[in-house]
Curated annotation (Swiss-Prot):
The active site is at D244, D464. Pepstatin A binds at D244, T245, G246, D464, T465, G466, T467, T468. Its main location: secreted. InterPro entries: Aspartic_peptidase_A1, Aspartic_peptidase_AS, PEPTIDASE_A1, Peptidase_aspartic_dom_sf, SAP-like. Contrary to other SAPs, SAP7 is insensitive to pepstatin A inhibition, which is due restriction of the accessibility of pepstatin A to the active site by Met-242 and Thr-467. Disulfide bonds join C260-C269, C500-C540. It comes from Candida albicans. N-glycosylated. Residues 180-208 have a biased composition (Low complexity). The keyword Metal-binding does not apply. Secreted aspartic peptidases (SAPs) are a group of ten acidic hydrolases considered as key virulence factors. These enzymes supply the fungus with nutrient amino acids as well as are able to degrade the selected host's proteins involved in the immune defense. Plays a key role in defense against host by cleaving histatin-5 (Hst 5), a peptide from human saliva that carries out fungicidal activity. The cleavage rate decreases in an order of SAP2 > SAP9 > SAP3 > SAP7 > SAP4 > SAP1 > SAP8. The cleavage of Hst 5 by SAP7 results mainly in the appearance of the long DSHAKRHHGYKRKFHEKHHSH peptide which is then slowly proeeded to DSHAKRHHGYKR. It is an enzyme of class 3 (hydrolase). This is Secreted aspartic protease 7. Monomer.
């Protein structure tokens, strides 16, 4: 088996022991312009009134098939052919003799929940033990623990299979799962990557070939928003959309959008791609009008319909509901992953997160977000799973707060914000008229401690990837800015001025959630250079803006690992850990 796995590794197929198949797709970031007023805020404008063991055969099939394809169990060996990345490898893997002796026909084909090896032919532990530790070390993975290792795992997030990934890495992470008081080491290390993608004219897989478990969607960092690439229609058309936890609809810009340059408008619609429904044989127009307005001023109108959407090979939604927009000034569509209550149509429908569970792509309507650092090229949204390598400390769960007895926004209470200043380079000797630091307010002689802060009184706050900056009430923003000196509003930037040195490395804001979780965010995320004073000194404004809704946008979200569970109505958060390792566990 070791030699076969090495051959597969050489053919650019990597392995990871995790849930029943998961895929990684990248998220891209847009480039920021100057100032702050024109960045995306895709919060829709609405008046809101209104752990069971499987049979050994199942376990082994889940592990073998993603690696080798559909092999045949025959006596004490597994035979078959694996194809991928332009390579085809025939294999015959001999099972350990102790296993082969137990049954001439391999594992039982019945749905036997008893995993006793003496009753099922051979055990999953036998298979895992047959792979040498040297091989796991070779590909950069820790050898997965077996029952004989007395290893523990979180009962809420149970790994169940192996999947193909691109970049083998390893990390063992101590973690506490949402809703669980016990801390456990993740029993499966995995690699985030993108599985081989279907060709442009490939058809979405039938439900019989779909995988269940967890899958990544890569998010490309454009500096103002995060974009994901989806394949829609038959044959597939590749279109980028921005990922948005603050809305619920998926919509694509139509090739017929009147605002596109090719149609006489001013928008470069080719930059992120458009959907031409006339070229899709599987498109169905349901004749329902669609219209939505966002707080950043963008609007979109078109019609609702259904078509097939592919995220990665084996992970697709058939007859997904979405809108095709023929009139918008936005250059990119939106992939809303919020509650259905935020849908911009009167008759509610099954949006994509819920359709993923309905069509068995994931076991629970949940996803986790890791945007990585500000300078990172991409982040990830992981549907149906948690990557324990992407955070430090414990995940703390907070109940999502309802709005008028309905789950509408993914909002949790924000208790307070404090500041720590440890780097005073260029803090003094500022020109007259500039925003001098208020000595004694938050300057603690270089110590990493807090003598104060701003009490936000558990303000309900939306965690929103569709918003570039963050928003609090005018009074709250002024209180935070007041920690740094004079409170001056800049009309041109539509934001409050702040001393540029506050953004020095080593300075940070600490966000307190119910005195249970504290997230540190570098102040550089909130200090935005927008020009110069008349004196020539640099002018900066604060990246928490005054608004009617409390929103923690991308400049906060990059510092947190967040798990959105729309089924149990909780959001779990922890301090983000920037690295390239993975330890993925599907949520069951």
């Amino acid at each position: 088996m070791q030699r076969v796995l090495e051959l597969l590794l050489l053919s650019s197929t990597a392995l990871a022991v995790i849930g029943d198949g998961f895929i990684a797709l990248p998220v891209h970031k847009l480039q920021a312009g100057e100032g702050s007023a024109h960045f995306p805020n895709r919060l829709p404008i609405f008046d809101v009134v209104n752990g069971v063991a499987k049979s050994v055969e199942d376990d082994v099939n889940q592990i073998i098939q993603p690696i080798f394809g559909n092999g045949i169990f025959s006596g004490g060996s597994i035979q078959g052919t694996h194809s991928g990345n332009g390579h085809s490898v025939k294999y015959e893997v001999s099972l350990p003799s102790s296993s082969a002796q137990k049954g001439s026909n391999g594992p039982s084909s019945t749905d036997n929940k008893d995993t006793d090896p003496s009753k099922t032919g051979f055990s999953l532990d036998d298979l895992m033990n047959s792979i040498s530790t040297d091989f796991w070390n070779l590909i950069g993975l820790n050898k997965p623990p077996t029952s004989s290792d007395n290893g523990s795992k979180d009962a809420d997030f149970t790994p169940s299979a192996v999947s193909q990934v691109e970049q083998p890495t390893s990390k063992s992470v101590e973690s506490t799962a949402p809703g669980s008081a016990s801390s456990a080491s993740s029993s499966s290390s995995s690699e985030a990557a993108s599985s081989s993608q279907p060709s442009e004219d490939s058809q979405p897989s039938s439900s019989a070939n779909k995988k269940t478990g967890a899958f990544f969607l890569s998010l490309d960092n454009t500096q103002t928003l995060y974009t994901a690439t989806l394949k829609v229609g038959s044959p597939a058309q590749e279109v980028q959309v921005m990922i948005d936890t603050g809305s619920s609809d998926l919509w694509f810009i139509s090739s017929g959008n009147s605002q596109c340059k090719v149609n006489g408008g001013s928008i470069d619609c080719d930059k992120y791609g458009v959907f031409d429904k006339s070229k899709s044989s599987s498109w169905h127009d349901n004749k329902t009008d669609y219209s939505i307005s966002y707080y950043d001023g963008d609007k979109a109108s078109g019609t609702m319909g259904q078509d097939n959407i592919t995220f990665a090979d084996g992970f697709s939604i058939e007859n997904a509901n979405f809108a095709v927009i023929d009139n918008t000034t936005s250059s990119i569509g939106v992939f809303g992953v919020g509650y259905p209550e935020l849908e911009a149509v009167k008759s509610k429908y099954t949006n994509l997160p819920f359709a993923m569970k309905e069509q068995n792509l994931i076991a629970k309507v949940a996803y986790s977000l890791y945007l990585d650092s500000r300078d990172a090229v991409q982040g990830y949204i992981l549907f149906g799973g948690i990557d324990h390598a992407f955070y430090t400390g414990d995940l703390k769960a907070f109940d999502i707060v309802q709005c008028n007895d309905k789950y509408v926004y993914s909002q949790i209470p924000l208790t307070s914000v404090a500041s720590s200043l440890n780097n005073y380079t260029n803090a003094y000797g500022l020109p007259a008229g500039s925003n001098h630091p208020k000595v004694g307010a938050v300057i603690y002689n270089g110590t990493d401690s807090f003598n104060g802060g701003v009490d936000l009184k558990d303000t309900l706050t939306l965690l929103d990837t569709g918003t570039t900056y963050s928003y609090l009430s005018k009074d709250q923003v002024e209180s935070i800015v007041g920690l740094y000196g004079n409170v001056t509003y800049n009309d041109a930037g539509k934001a409050y001025e702040v001393p540029c040195w506050v953004g020095n490395p080593g300075n940070y804001l600490e966000f307190n959630f119910k005195n249970e979780q504290y997230i540190k965010v570098p102040t550089s995320e909130f200090v935005i250079s927008v020009g110069t004073y008349a004196s020539g000194a640099e002018l900066c404004v604060f990246g928490i803006l005054p608004g009617t809704h409390s929103i923690l946008g991308d400049n906060f979200m990059r510092s947190v690992y967040a798990v959105f569970d729309l089924e149990d109505h909780v959001i779990s958060i922890a301090q983000a850990a920037y690295n390239d390792n993975h330890a993925v566990v599907p949520i069951e």
